[in-house]
Structure formats: structure tokens, C-alpha cells
């Protein structure tokens, strides 16, 4: 992977690299084994670009706002409309939130159950007071839905979401 024409890291068995292609010729690179301070995530997307937004079908009454593309993909596999900002600390602009609020009868906020996720969900709720905030229960030892599905399976993931929503 290059940043400003300089090679900053290479793929290896011990350093896997995943690249998500986003709309408008944007990409997001993820290195799951990297330390947070050492380019764990790289992207040329702006804070205003929502992951999963271009895949919304607008054929359901519910939208889940989650924290990552991985969670969006997991929710979409359950036929649940989902989007995510570039990070939990990024704010979705007010106009977009109002548009989504008009389009969907029910909006659910499903961020990580850690400090950053809880804070991010509470901030988002200030702009979407009719939304429902849910978290993956901490006793599951999972911070998000994709981790839960990985640990407990697809069917249990669906059951948990049905119960929480």
C-alpha cells in the first residue's frame, strides 16, 4: 500500500490487507492485525461519504446506522438496510439525517458497545431523537454484530437482532 507515492506496508501472512471499493472511485484499506496508531484503516473517502448508502433499496421501513462497512455487509446479508459513517466519531450531516428520517419509519443506531461507540451513538441520537439505540450485549464478549455472527453464527445473529430491535 502506498501513501503519497511512498510504500508504507506490504501484504503478508502476518499482515493481511483488505480493500473495500467505495462509490466515486474511493477505497478503504483495512489491516486487521495492525495497531490502531499504525495505519489500521486508510481511506481517500471524505467524512461525508456514508458506507452502504449507494446500496440502499428504500424498500423497507427500517434503517440501521452502524459503525463499519463490515457491519453494514453483515446486516445486508440479513436483508436489513444499513449504512455507516467512515468512523463512529464522524458526524453524518444534518440534511442527510433528515432525509433518512423522512424515508424510513424506524431508524436503529447499532454502534459498538465500547466507550467510543456509546458516545458516538448518543451524539447521533441528539440529531435523531426518534431513533432507537441498541448494543450487542457485553456479556457476549462481542463489540459489534459482525463479531457476534462470527462467534455465534448467522441464525443466532438474526435472533439477537430481532430481540434487540
Model feature map: region roles:
Residues 60-63, 69-165:
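TOPRIM fold recognition
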Amino acid at each position: 500500500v502506498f501513501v503519497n507515492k511512498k510504500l508504507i506496508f506490504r501484504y503478508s501472512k502476518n499482515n493481511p490487507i483488505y480493500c473495500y471499493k467505495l462509490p466515486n472511485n474511493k477505497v478503504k484499506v483495512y489491516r486487521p492485525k495492525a495497531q490502531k496508531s499504525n495505519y489500521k484503516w486508510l481511506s481517500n473517502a471524505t467524512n461525508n461519504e456514508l458506507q452502504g448508502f449507494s446500496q440502499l433499496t428504500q424498500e423497507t421501513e427500517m434503517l440501521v446506522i452502524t459503525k463499519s462497512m463490515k457491519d453494514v455487509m453483515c446486516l445486508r446479508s440479513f436483508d436489513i438496510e444499513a449504512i455507516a459513517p467512515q468512523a463512529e466519531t464522524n458526524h453524518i450531516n444534518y440534511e442527510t439525517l433528515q432525509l433518512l428520517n423522512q424515508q424510513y419509519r424506524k431508524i436503529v443506531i447499532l454502534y459498538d458497545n465500547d466507550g467510543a461507540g456509546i458516545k458516538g451513538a448518543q451524539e447521533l441520537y441528539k440529531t435523531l431523537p426518534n431513533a432507537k439505540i441498541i448494543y450487542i450485549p457485553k456479556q457476549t464478549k462481542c463489540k459489534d454484530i459482525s463479531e457476534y455472527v462470527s462467534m455465534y453464527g448467522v441464525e443466532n445473529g438474526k435472533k439477537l437482532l430481532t430481540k434487540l430491535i
